[in-house]
Design a protein with these regions (language model features):
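Predominantly flavin-linked oxidoreductase catalytic cores and closely associated redox partners
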Residues: 1-85
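Electropositive phosphate-/nucleotide-binding environments in soluble metabolic enzymes
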Residues: 3, 33, 63, 125, ...
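Charged, low-complexity, helix/coiled-coil-prone segments
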Residues: 4-19, 71-86, 100-107, 137-141, ...
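Tryptophan-centric aromatic hotspots in well-structured domains and transmembrane helices
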Residues: 10, 36-38, 52, 98, ...
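Low-complexity, flexible helical/coil segments
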Residues: 12-23, 46-47, 84-90, 145-151, ...
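Short hydrophobic/aromatic-rich motifs at helix boundaries and adjacent loops
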Residues: 41-43, 110-114, 170-171
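FAD/FMN-dependent oxidoreductases across multiple families
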Residues: 57-141, 147, 153-158, 165
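C-terminal helical "tail/cap" subdomain of flavin- and related membrane-associated enzymes
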Residues: 140-263
């Protein structure tokens, strides 16, 4: 992606301390100094654990991937505590440059749905939701085309507008996920109720229709920019790093080396 470069390192583990009670099956996501991490529990007691980081942080690695993953997770004391008795079941794997978006979504005789058109950083686990909705909207376009309906052009434009709206809405939040201003707002207990409901609505996938939550989300963005400017030096530093990462292409990741090129 030209706007958001990311790299990920992940593995499966056993022995990771799980949450208890009603939270037992919940996914954990936590901010780190150099990105964020996930913990996804499986029914058999194992867990997927990984980190998403800036490409330049991955380039700085001087240890094997397994050790690099564990060292990065230690940036969060609560996560490190849950990993104390963890045992890897698979070698750590690295992936980079996984966010992308095509320039065109449809054309004469074709349209792209799901990952065929775009893949965004899975901060909010939005991939399946975006794919299913684009598939449903795309089916209406195909139906109109096969019937020779005069609505074909209108439905095709509607398909593109809705899918791009959903991706753009998620992307705005994803691109700012590691910004200090965003983190302060996202976890603030002092958010107005309407803005909090709007954020929860977004996380639930309400990103396509003309929802009544769109104005509160707009207010969230306004407040974000105000908070950004109040601490502009730190926020600008993080923003510059993100932009620099979007220009770095990691071409190969081995156990001890990272090869890269800059656009």
């Amino acid at each position: 992606s030209k706007k958001h470069g990311s790299a990920a390192v992940f593995s499966h583990f056993e022995g990771v301390t799980r949450l208890t009670g009603l939270d037992e099956g919940n996914i954990t996501a936590a901010w780190l100094d150099d990105g964020w991490c996930w913990m996804i529990p499986f029914k058999d007691g194992t867990m997927s654990v990984g980190v998403v980081c800036h490409p330049d942080y991955l380039k700085s690695r001087r240890t094997p991937l397994d050790q690099f993953l564990l060292d990065t997770l230690r940036q969060s004391p609560p996560i490190a505590a849950r990993m104390e008795r963890a045992r890897p079941l698979t070698p750590a794997y690295a992936a980079a440059n996984f966010s992308y978006r095509r320039d065109t979504m449809s054309g004469d005789g074709y349209l792209m749905i799901g990952d065929a058109f775009a893949f965004i950083d899975p901060v909010f686990s939005s991939g399946v939701h975006l794919a299913l909705n684009s598939g449903s909207l795309g089916a209406e376009v195909v139906d109109a085309f096969l019937r020779g309906s005069p609505e074909y052009a209108v439905r095709r434009k509607h398909f593109e507008r809705m899918v791009r709206r959903g991706i753009d809405t998620f992307s705005w939040f994803i691109h700012r996920f590691n910004q200090p201003a965003f983190q302060a707002l996202f976890v603030s207990p002092k958010r107005p109720a309407k803005i909090e409901r709007a954020v929860l609505s977004l996380l639930a996938g309400d990103v396509f229709a003309q929802s009544k939550m769109r104005f509160p989300l707009f207010l969230f963005k306004v407040v974000y920019y105000v908070v950004f400017m109040l601490n502009w030096k730190e926020n600008w530093s993080v923003a510059r790093r993100r932009k620099r990462g979007s220009r770095t292409t990691v071409t190969e990741v081995t156990d001890y080396a990272v090869k890269s090129a800059s656009a």
